[in-house]
Amino acid sequence: MGRRRRSREMALQVLYQMEMAVLPPEEALGLYYQLFDDDEKHRVPAEVRPFAEEIVRGVSLHRARIDEMITSASEHWRLARMSLVDRNILRIAVFEMLFCFDIPPKVSINEAIDLGKTFGSPDSGAFINGILDHILPLLEANGRIDRRDSA
């Protein structure tokens, strides 16, 4: 499994913890490291941490904007009705599409679908794909993705 994939998985777990326990990013990250650093088998490798932390902090900082985009693209679904896992996977992908210029949007979408299949319900992959497929053209139309290869 690649470094960024592991970073996304870690970020998903931390974002989930933040929402469940109503924790700020730094506290949630600290608890995550505390929990896993003592366990050799599950210790988070140093190379995974920076991107995971960037995602966690970025999603937290830009959450209102990210949630607004998800809400506008999700017909008949309020954000609060979405599963906690799906909602945070969507947040990660939208954060990447908005702020991680070195990651092609299609990669962010495919990674989100894979995370949904791994951590979500049997329908999560298709649900996540549908929402992100609505968001991508909006970003392209607003010139947000013109600096990257979206193919």
Curated annotation (Swiss-Prot):
Transmembrane segments: none annotated. One of its GO terms (cellular component) is cytosol. GO terms for molecular function: RNA binding. The keyword Transcription applies. The keyword Glycosyltransferase does not apply. GO terms for biological process: DNA-templated transcription termination; transcription antitermination. It holds the Pfam family NusB. Keywords: RNA-binding, Transcription, Transcription antitermination, Transcription regulation. Belongs to the NusB family. HAMAP family: NusB. This is Transcription antitermination protein NusB.
